[in-house]
Amino acid sequence: MDMDTQEAELSSQLENLTINSPRKLRSNAHSNSGKVFKEYESNHDFQDSNFTSQVVEPAISDSVKKPPTMTVLNNYSTVHQKVPSGFSGTTATSHQEAQWKQYFPGIGSGGGTNFGGAVGTANKVPESDLIVSDLVKDLSGVLETNTFKRHLDMKNKTTTMQTHENHDTISISHSKDFFNAEKVSSSFSDDSDSGPAAEAHDVFDGILQKQKSNYLVGSYPSNSNNKNNNNNNNNNNNNSININNKDNARTKEEDEEDTSNSFEFSSSSSMSSSQTQSGRKSKVLKKPPLNTISPGQLGYQFNHTHGAWDPPLNQGLDVSSSHSLDNTSSNQSQFATMVPTGDNHTNGKAPSILDKKAYELTSTKPGDVGYRQKKIQEEENLANSDDTPLDTPKFNDLFTKNGTRAKVKGQMRTSRSISNSNLLEAHKKLKTFPAERVEDITSISEVNTSFNETEKQLISILTSKLSGSPSYDSDWEKILKVDLSRGKLKNMFGMQRLLPNVLVLNLSDNEMNTLEGIPSNVVQLFCSNNKITSAHCSLAGFHDLECLDLSYNLLNTSLKFLSLCHHLQEVNLSYNSIQSLEGIGSSRMKKLNLSNNEINGIIDFEQLILTNNSVVGGWLTVEVLDLSNNNIIGVRNINCLPRLKVLNLNGNPLVSIVESSKMENGTLRALSIKNTGGALSKLQNYKLDDQFTFPYQNLKILKLDGFAQLSKWQKWPATLQILEINGGLASSLPRFSSLKSTNLYSLTIANVRDFTHLPVDLSKELPFLQELHLPGNNLQNAHKLTKTLPRQSVKFLDLRNNPITTPRHDRASTSLHYRQLLQLAGLCQQQCPALATLWLDDTPAPTATNL
């Protein structure tokens, strides 16, 4: 019967279908020839839930118990099983029949005639009423003729299960119609439609196969409805798969676990008859977990005394591939046979072991079902095989106790072989452990083992340095002071364990780029001339640190890393690239050296204190501050530093130093403003009424470049003891009479090219002067010079680089010049009896006290 004939018959039957409301017998029900039916309700009052009940009693057959979960149907509708009346939990009642029967002639007139023409008993409850929720025309062209067949008749046509108890072998036949979606159209009986659900699922399975749905080959719903399909397909199959079971017994727990899954993905499309009859499904294969390969699994043993791995006896063994190792915890002796791959397209990959079973494929012809089964089995083997790429388990000989390095000669070794050259290349990329993240490690070769290398080097250096010390103690836990300078150390990982109680640690002149690994209880830490950057300069945990030297490093930001150390007293950060003075925090430091950095602009200490927002510590405790050799052009409010005693501003292009705050600093004792390049023009306190008064009246030491304002100051600090003026003009020199009120004992006037002589009354103006430094001036007359010197107090005299000490080009010889220097020395000694040191040339001239 062709498709056109089917459509014609179906259309003729649908012509008799009427949708008119039937006659009413009573308010809620009506009858047709004595049968009582539910009243037909309008669409607005119709409830879809009346035809979607899934709750059934256990007495119902397997074919209607568990409708499969159809995830994708290519927009085709599903078939729902209507539960017979008389069961609890359903929407049907005992006195009602399906609505559609009343619209067909001959149904319900006491004969109980079924749609298929079979005659049943009048009192028989229909086993099932199908409700197909979509247009029938959607299935035209794909519906088969003999669709709803008797379930028992189909069972009789299937291939029976053959069980061989001696060999424990089960033979199951498969039909190629399953793969081709060709259903059997033999002459089955149309008497009674006792199990149409399974047949309906077969129809939809054929639709999905023909329409190329997203069901994968080998994936089939593993429920009770599939039993009929598998049994029908077995009729036309002459090829078989022999399954050698070592253990057919399955526990109850395994059955329950298997039935919880809706689908099964396996290489075989059919199940064994024993499984189909009991509702069991094949257990889903799982890949064995991958185990981590450690040095201990390679035979190495860690030596805690030497801090290294002891190599195994078979150290020369080369493991060329990680697949040669068994990473699973299973016992391979339990598996009898492995599935052969058969073809060359597997590229030599090892076959997978399948749950203690050996599968033997008996058909190899390309046209047979067994051949296709074999191909599908091989694809599953490749999918389930452990082909995860792993690097070869490698171990560097540098980390072993012997520390030997094997040299590879001859042929080239593969990238997976263990070779020292490969290992050393890997370690070159892993020198900076803190910059790497553990989550980025994807293979064994990327694991950073530089910790063991550093600790080994550290132990060697400690042994060599401590053994030469007279106070050497074999117990390293008692060591309090260690000097590891010039050791070419890159980091200090492991030192906390080796030297837990060290207090003074010198790590200068190494190659460190981080402070990690240094014992946190250290009090004095010297790390100058390394490669430490601001990103890896963390002082968190160094709560007892008091002295820190990080000079000659790569620090390039601010002082925020110092804020965590509250007990810091001395910090040397010279010769870095620090750009800001912010972030000092509440550390109570006293000495801070920031010379030779990249600090620029105007420094306002009042603003720094407000920004720091620290009641105690920070800038409020600084006593010695060195800002020399930066790019500072202005300084303001030095008086805001209440404890500042020494300030060094040499080597900056300073233009002005101005005090504008009301605070007065009575602690500043030394101020140095030299080598400004002649830019200095203002040194003034705007809060003082007398602008001719020096701004800092408690100074003892003042060193500065000569500028015009010096000659205008009339009141110098009474406490001034050392005055040094470098450069400028003679007219800008201070008046010596204004210095009479000071306690000056050392005066330096250097590099003033137009300064030709001392004032005549110098001995009266500076009666307590002991040191007179006059290098690089234009002093020409020795007799005038000696007459103006303070006779009783001068002990040190420096006359270098003046005309009276420099030989002229027309002089006869060097010996003559030497005799003139001796005469000058005699005059100075005669004028100043207390003179102890006289500098006339690069070497001190002989005096009466040192002859």
UniProtKB/Swiss-Prot annotation:
Swiss-Prot/TrEMBL keywords: Cell cycle, Cell division, Cytoplasm, Cytoskeleton, Isopeptide bond, Leucine-rich repeat, Meiosis, Mitosis, Nucleus, Phosphoprotein, Repeat, Ubl conjugation
Record's compositionally biased regions (Polar residues): 8-21, 291-304
Record note on modification: Phosphorylated from S/G2 phase until the end of mitosis.
Modified residues (Phosphothreonine): T388, T392
Biased composition regions of type Low complexity, renumbered to the chain: 223-246, 260-278, 320-333
Entry keyword annotation includes Nucleus: yes
Placement of LRR repeats on the sequence: 544-566, 567-588, 589-609, 621-642, 643-664
Phosphoserine: modified positions: S417, S419
Note: Present with 892 molecules/cell in log phase SD medium.
Protein name: Protein NUD1
Gene that this polypeptide is encoded by: NUD1
